[in-house]
Curated annotation (Swiss-Prot):
Pfam assignment, any one: Ribonuc_red_sm
Localization (cell): Host membrane
EC numbers: 1.17.4.1
Entry keyword set: DNA replication, Host membrane, Iron, Membrane, Metal-binding, Oxidoreductase, Transmembrane, Transmembrane helix, Viral latency, Viral reactivation from latency
Cofactor(s) demanded: Fe cation
Name assigned to this protein: Ribonucleoside-diphosphate reductase small subunit
EC class: oxidoreductase
Quaternary assembly: Heterotetramer composed of a homodimer of the large subunit (R1) and a homodimer of the small subunit (R2). Larger multisubunit protein complex are also active, composed of (R1)n(R2)n.
Sites where the protein binds Fe cation 1: 94, 124, 127
Record flagged with keyword Oxidoreductase: yes
One GO location term (cellular component): membrane
Reaction catalyzed: a 2'-deoxyribonucleoside 5'-diphosphate + [thioredoxin]-disulfide + H2O = a ribonucleoside 5'-diphosphate + [thioredoxin]-dithiol
Enzyme active site: 131
Amino acid sequence: MDSAAPALSPALTAHTGHSATADLAIQIPKCPDPERYFYTSQCPDINHLRSLSILNRWLETELVFVGDEEDVSKLSEGELSFYRFLFAFLSAADDLVTENLGGLSGLFEQKDILHYYVEQECIEVAHSRVYNIIQLVLFHNNDQARREYVAGTINHPAIRAKVDWLEARVRECASVPEKFILMILIEGIFFAASFAAIAYLRTNNLLRVTCQSNDLISRDEAVHTTASCYIYNNYLGGHAKPPPDRVYGLFRQAVEIEIGFIRSQAPTDSHILSPAALAAIENYVRFSADRLLGLIHMKPLFSAPPPDASFPLSLMSTDKHTNFFECRSTSYAGAVVNDL
C-alpha cells in the first residue's frame, strides 16, 4: 500500500560504505513553500469530516458478539448462506478500498486531505477486523470452514461482476475526477444493498451486535463517500470533469450491478428478507445513487422516493441512548446524513 505523501517529501540518498544513519540525506528545495512545513487549514469541509471521524473512532475490541452465535442457529439454511456470502464480499471489498486509499492521498498536497485519509485508513482497518469476527461467528468459529468457503466464493459470478466492471472502468479511466466517481460508486453503491440486507436482521431481533457493527460501518462509509464528493467538487480544479453522460452512465451501470447482486443471492425461504423487503432494498440503492448525484451537483437519475420510516437503515438516523446492556453505543456525533 502506498503511504500518504509526507509534507516534507524528502529525497533520501544512499551512500555506499556508511552506516544506515549516515546514508539518509534530506534535501530541502532552495526556494521552499513555507506552508509545506506547518499546518494550514485549506479544506474546511474535509477538515470537518476528519474531526467527525476522530470524534467517532471505534475499535473492534469494543464490540462483544455475545448472543450472535446463538442467533446463527435461528437462520434458515438459505439465510445463513446469504449472509455468509455478503460478509465474504464485504470483507474482500473493504480490503480493496484500503489498498487504494494510499494512491488517492498521493495526489494531493493539502494537509487537510492527507490527514483525513489517515483517519479513513485507520477506520477501514477496524472494518476489516470486525468482518473477520463476524465471518467466524457465521461459521460457528470454524476457521477452516470459513477459509474453504471464502476460497470457493470469492470468484462467484455475482462478485466477479462487480470486480470485472470496476477493473474495466479503471483501465479506461481518462482522468483523476473519474477515479473519484469510481470511489463514490464503490463505497456509496456497491455496499448499499449489503448494508440494508444486514439491517433487516434488526427487525427480527437477530445478531444484535452484528447489527451494531453494521450501523457503525455504514455510517463511516457515509462519511467516506461524502469526502470523495467534496474532493470531486472542490479540489480537482486542474482536471477536467467527465461529461454528464459519462457520469450518468457509470451510475446507471453500478446500480444495475448492485441490484443484480442482491437479487442473485437473496434467499427464497426467508422470513427476514421478504419480496417487499427486497423491493425496498432495490429502491434504496436507486435512492442512494440519486442522493450521491445531488452531492456532486447533478440531477437525479432515477427519481427514487426516500425509504419509508420502517426501512431498517432509517433507524440509524434517530438519536440513540446507550443503556446498561449495550455493548457499544452506536450514536454518531455530528450531522452527517447517512445514505447507506
